[in-house]
Amino acid sequence: GISLSGLASAVANEGGVGVISSAGLGLLYRNLSKDYIQASIMGLKEERCKAREKTKGVIGVNVMVAMSNFADMVKTAIAEKADIIFSGAGLPLNLPSFLQKDSVTKLVPIVSSARAARVITEKWHNLYNYLPDAFVVEGPKAGGHLGFKDEQINDEHFSLEHILPEVIDEVKDIETHYGKNIPVIVAGGIYTGEDIKRFMDMGAAGVQ
């Protein structure tokens, strides 16, 4: 696994947000438990602890909605006081339900459309009186489970350059309606400093 404590702490030490992937930890930590679910929980605790020993920076956890142990990983990340949970590969509609009164973890959905941002916001507010702390917007060139079709990958109508302004406009409406600042972070197919500047100039608050 690449997206574990080593990379996360290195990124955090450089001023970025270090992210630990929760996917497949039960396989990496089979020595701790023969039960995959339990090994995954113990593995996430171990990786979070290792990261914290190496940095005082921001450490987040990525938890995919599509994972069978989604709830266990979210609960563990919150209990371990992860700074942020990033969640995509589906709409994380029930993510705020796992927060406790003393929870410090911020919740950041990963979306690929303005509509997804609106649906998540309305659901979270109506059911949990909670609003996203930020959004990550991924285009078809991002690695992961995005739901884009093959023919859409190189279609400019589905490009990040096309999607980002739509999401930013949607989030501006959300900010105005609810009175909360919600940063929009852009991700997928961004390689160079020029790429970063281009998307920041378009209104992105950050780049992944």
Predicted segments — roles?
Residues 1-178:
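Active-site entrance/lid segments in N-terminal catalytic domains of soluble metabolic enzymes
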Residues 133, 180-182, 205:
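Structural beta-strand/beta-sheet cores of well-ordered domains, especially the beta-sheet scaffolds
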Residues 136, 185-186, 208:
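Structured core elements
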Residues 142, 190-193:
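Short, catalytically relevant binding-site loops at active-site mouths
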Residues 164, 193-196:
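A general structural signal for well-ordered alpha-helical packing
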Residues 183-191:
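Glycine-rich beta-strand-to-loop/alpha-helix junction loops that act as flexible
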Residues 197-208:
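A compact, surface-exposed functional segment
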